[in-house]
Amino acid sequence: MEKMRVVLITLLLFIGAAVAEKAGNGKAANNPAEDASDGEHNLVEEAGGIGDAITPAEGKALISAYESARFKKFVTHCSSHVAQTCSGNDPLHASGRCHGINVPLGLSFCLFDSMEKCLGDHEAKLIDPNPGPMSAIPNSIQSQQLLIETVKFRTVLKTCTRVSAKFCLSAPNVDTSVLPACLGPSLNQCVYPAADAFTPGPPLELPPIIIMN
């Protein structure tokens, strides 16, 4: 009976995650630490910048809702890597959904896909929360907890890649040479906004773009 209860709860989680992703497509969550069902808002337009969207105090209070050591261990490393990849500075990986990085939607797709791949390379793979065959549903409490962690982190990551992409592409005089310097810190601050998890540096000063006639 207990096993059946776990299976049913897990199935509902799968379905709920899939519905939440479809309902929130193209938007950004009001706070990345909140549950996926809370809906999404455009943080950049409302707050004017990534630093105002999520304060360190808010992040520290809410971080326990979605933080997972399994993912956090590699996020900083992967953020730096995907920032290079998605800025077009890594020709070996500049393919597939990384095309169109000069627009927020294309850049956010690239950031999410590249982060997913990087985490997978470090054996911290994001499990796809979309419903699958009944035989594929985890049947243990441990698997259920892992699914919950993954769904929450996946939602946070989807939100933060959209926010970071729009924020960094809206910066003045942005080009591919300075884009990584914005994307890496912005993504880290959004995913883990607690003061002790990430300390932002001084405001980024972008060099002017010289147009040759």
UniProtKB/Swiss-Prot annotation:
GO terms under biological process: nodulation
Residues in the signal sequence: 1-20
Alphabetical keyword list: Nodulation, Signal
InterPro entries tied to this protein: Nodulin
Source organism superkingdom: Eukaryota
Induction line: During nodulation in legume roots after Rhizobium infection.
Family: Belongs to the nodulin 20 family.
Protein name per Swiss-Prot or TrEMBL: Nodulin-27
Organism field: Glycine max (Soybean)
